[in-house]
Amino acid sequence: MSESPERTDPTPEASGGPEATPPPTVEGAAETAAPEAKASGGSAAGLVAAGIFASRIIGLVRDRAIGYFFGVGAFSDVYRLGLRAPNLLQNLLGEGTLSAAFIPIYSRMSEEGREEDAARFAGAVLGLLAVVSFSIALLGVLFADVVVGVLQPGWIGDAARVTSGEIPVNRYDLAVMVVRLAFPMTAILVLSAWALGVLNSHRKFLLSYFAPVAWNVALLVALGVGAYLYLDDPLGIAGDAVPPEALAQLLVALFVGGIVGGVLQLGVQLPSVLRLLRVFRPSVSLKVPGVREGVRAFVPVVLGRGAYQLSGYLDVFLSSFLAAGALAALSNAQTLYLLPISLFGMSVAASELPELSRISRDELSTFLERVRRSLGQILYLVVPTVVGYLAFGYLVVGVLYQTGQFGVEDTWVVYFVLAAYTLGLAATTASRLLQNAFYALDDTKTPARIAIWRVAISAAVGSALMLVFDRLSVFDVVGVGEEASSLQLGAVGLALG
């Protein structure tokens, strides 16, 4: 199973995904590169791809730094759970949902010259998003212990495992701490997705997709400061035993940096958003023109996004019954898996949605031709990536991640998971465009139905294969490491689902 690819990378999907402030010239570059004049599909997709590429590259640097300190093990599992636990907010209220329920309506209002109605609609959406997202975040903070227990029931008995020396840290207790920081961070990132929706509707693509760089940089700064404060020798930990208490403090510092990064990611977009809206009235009124229509579109999208979210949570739930490091291996592989989806799928899909929404319903042939051309563009770029990952994925993983506590065994297990994900890469990437094509036609039910079926099949296959592959280890397959302590490959079975 694989999580839904999202632009922001608190990943992630994405990955990401999701990521201090960018240089002051970024906003000016965005204004120059994405003028009010109608951008061509290719140039708009190029702007989106440029922003996503910058965010993903700095995200890879972030993951390499995290791998250096935590490797693939108990601490990295807690880090990944901290990002995934509040993903309900990100996936149900973030960019994917706003693409269906906000951008088409806002774009049509702007195209019809109803600038004041569009601004009032945007303000109402922001108000409603803020109320819902921060309410859920508050519940997440108050009931973090329940959230962790439900998502990772296999961690509840960690106190005994620490006593026996099986693992270095009580993952359950540490996860509760970081989840309480992760929920507010994700609520802020949801508001950042609203800003992205406004900018995309006005064809301002570059700034909105560069903004996650701020999140990633904030995490890197927090990691560096934390390492300086808590570790005796931050630059010489390869192969050495680092006190678990120090690594736990470092992990908490990382999530504090995530909150700061969320504020920065939203903040770099707000000045441009406010200039575009001109008349801006935040509210929580359902009587504002367009809001009820948006809510009607929102409900089936939430069902579809909820299905994807269930898939991601099933990965987390099932991985708790596998050996330590399974969740980290899945997440490290997903970072690479989501890169071509973001660059070649999401970039085209995001830039095409406002344009497809503007095409008259009477011009179906024009609509289909635009979708067909964009689909060909995506596959032309993705198919070579599939071949490259399968043939050279081990080298890619090694170059990007193998450092410090991240060793050769870790590289092999992440490569095997990446290869499993890669088998479905072309289909997943193309689905991003097709999903947005349905949204542009005001059809949010069809993608939701497809998502539910996809998740059901994925869960059944992944949970069965997980048990088969968990009997194998890296030592069994490639003879690397020690037979008694070699990393297991149960995560590969989950990825194949």
Predicted regions and their residues:
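Membrane-embedded alpha-helical bundles of multi-pass transporters/translocases
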Residues: 2-497
